[in-house]
Amino acid sequence: MAAFGLVRFQAYGQTPPPTADPYANNADAGKLKFPLAAPAGKDSGAITTAPPGAVNQGMLDPAKWKYGPAYDAPTNSKIWNPVMIKMMKGEKVTGGTVFSTDSPQTYCAMANAGYDFIWTEMQHDARDWDAVGRMWKACPHAKAVPGVRVAYTDEREIQHAMDLGALVIVIPTVRSVEEGKAARDWTMFPPAGKRSQGGGQAFDPDMWGSVPGGYRNTINDNVVLIEMIETLDGAVAAREIAGLAGVTAVFAASGDLGNFSGYKQGTPDYERLINIVHDAALGAGKRLCGPFAWRDRPDFTCFQNASETAAIARGVAAELGPLKDTQGKPEVGPYAPKK
């Protein structure tokens, strides 16, 4: 639908200004000519015959369609997502978790605290996407880029995340290569995927609308896609999932691999599952992610850190040092020691 907004500007050889509104640049009625339109009241035969000069001739066949150059990234375009830059270099990447707040102020404090990206939790928290959009829009160019763990691999979840401006997408409980491929498809624009172009604040010039090369043409190269291996079925398919084009990293889920296997960290059965994910990432040349406690585990280079409430507690402890928890102890009242 948003492609209609390009008509007037393309007719004059201009580029439409970036905007979050997909209809803002619609051409005025009555000013367009349609030299290739079907004749009024007649079947044009377009399903079998292309107009003269068309690249794709013959019967319309999606499997054989030659995708056009309209959305090619500029030649030698540079990556503008700092997390992708670190991922490509194999450097260690940290994601601070925003779990329960919907406060833009708290989000922005986390985003400027020193993490590489913010893991906005949407699988296990009940906040809505409007709240997420407000948080991300409050400080779009903070030190940490906006990221999110969506609830599932469906179009609605991932489309909301991408249209709001996510630069890191985390997909939970990927159980098969089919699920992994679906997640990739909803994350990426054609021809790499199936993401619909429908506007959203990601296109706003105050967010990513003014990036070099344009958001639509460059986001496929910049979005970081992390797929989580959390189940036994996922472990079986881990090599295929890691090998998917467009998947940046696989995540060995420390909690749910225990939950779904019945074994705790450190036991042979549990560690076997983690090593399967490890081997899948190495074999595919992809990054390997896990909890921050595994910062020094071999070959792990991206991590989920604790939540905003845990970060506050750690920060206060570091600031107060020996003065932490030295409150006065009255003998009576609600602050008196419990007997």
In which residue ranges do the predicted regions lie?
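N-terminal amphipathic alpha-helix/helix-capping segment at the start of soluble metabolic enzymes
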Residues: 30-41, 45-97, 208-221
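Active-site mouth loops of central-metabolism enzymes
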Residues: 88-104, 147-151, 223-236, 307
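Conserved, mostly hydrophobic/aromatic
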Residues: 96, 121, 169, 183, ...
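Catalytic cores of alpha/beta
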Residues: 106, 148, 153-167, 171, ...
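Alpha-helix-loop-beta-strand connector modules within alpha/beta enzyme cores
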Residues: 129-155, 159, 187-193, 218-220, ...
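C-terminal helical cap(s) of enzyme catalytic domains, especially alpha/beta-barrels
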Residues: 135, 177-192, 263, 309-333
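Glycine-rich phosphate-binding active-site loops on the catalytic face of alpha/beta enzymes
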Residues: 168-179, 250-260, 301-320
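Conserved anion-binding
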Residues: 168-244
